[in-house]
Amino acid sequence: MQQLEEVVGQARAEIEGVSDIAALDEIRVKYLGKKGFFTEQMKGLGALSAEERPAAGAVINQAKQQVQDALNERREALEIAVLNQKLAAETIDVSLPGRRIENGGLHPVTRTIERIERLFGEMGFKVARGPEIEDGFHNFDALNIPAHHPARTDHDTFYFNPDLMLRTHTSGVQIRTMEHQQPPIRIIAPGRVYRNDYDMTHTPMFHQVEGLLVDEHASFTELKGILHDFLRNYFEEDLTIRFRPSYFPFTEPSAEVDVMGKNGKWLEVLGCGMVHPNVLRSVGIDPEKYSGFAFGMGVERLTMLRYGVNDLRAFFENDLRFLKQFK
């Protein structure tokens, strides 16, 4: 018994004296391993009588447990010390700035659409949307565009079948709105449109914003005032603006709107006019009671004029050197 107490004391002293886990494992093997001190002591129990064996075994196990507890306690302390040392070596300066993430930006065409929606929204216009695949009635017939009109040929229009096509303008949204809503109507219809054309100033897909107002006393004077306000707010300049006579099948009278450029030349920016009575009749609105006006503009053209871009195709080539200028 006294010998075991001495061994336990010696083991505890050795355990407290180690400074790393490898040395601690050597002590564990020395005392608790297959050939360790306590294993040999247990083997010696066979030499004792059956009456002495249980008491002696209990004493040995108690001493063995004391050594095991000392080993566990020391191992935990060493592991904590190793962890603290590792954490100290890997200290992070949390005050250092992080890696800069480059933020994206809206496409210039998207910026223009949002700007147009906001400016007309301030004048009481709501945004209306419709399908990009249209039928002949909504894309042509209801807009007073006859069957022989050149816009209806496959040179200008992408057809799926004789009566189904990619819309060539967002005017179909105006027709659908008038079919389902009684005047007063005050909407703009932004969206993608498609025409069979491709050069520096045309692409097969481009964006339009068309507007429509139908009420009992809509007038060309009101149309001019709205477009004057829009253009001056859009370009943020007190522009010189002119309305010159033009022709569109769906408006009468019709006009095109020009602004004076910095080079002293007129630049066409949009078309407009009073809604043709035939268009109102096609959707069940009485032209004797109601009148209306409509206008339409190419978003890419307005974007080119605002940002000084010369080639329309640059908007669709995904060149980051170009797009980063608009962030």
Swiss-Prot record:
Keywords in alphabetical order: Aminoacyl-tRNA synthetase, ATP-binding, Cytoplasm, Ligase, Magnesium, Metal-binding, Nucleotide-binding, Protein biosynthesis
Catalytic reaction(s) noted: tRNA(Phe) + L-phenylalanine + ATP = L-phenylalanyl-tRNA(Phe) + AMP + diphosphate + H(+)
This protein's record includes keyword Ligase: yes
Cofactor binding note: Binds 2 magnesium ions per tetramer.
Binding site for Mg(2+): E252
Residue ranges crossing the lipid bilayer per the database entry: none
GO CC field: cytoplasm
EC numbers: 6.1.1.20
Protein name in UniProt: Phenylalanine--tRNA ligase alpha subunit
Organism annotation: Aeromonas hydrophila subsp. hydrophila (strain ATCC 7966 / DSM 30187 / BCRC 13018 / CCUG 14551 / JCM 1027 / KCTC 2358 / NCIMB 9240 / NCTC 8049)
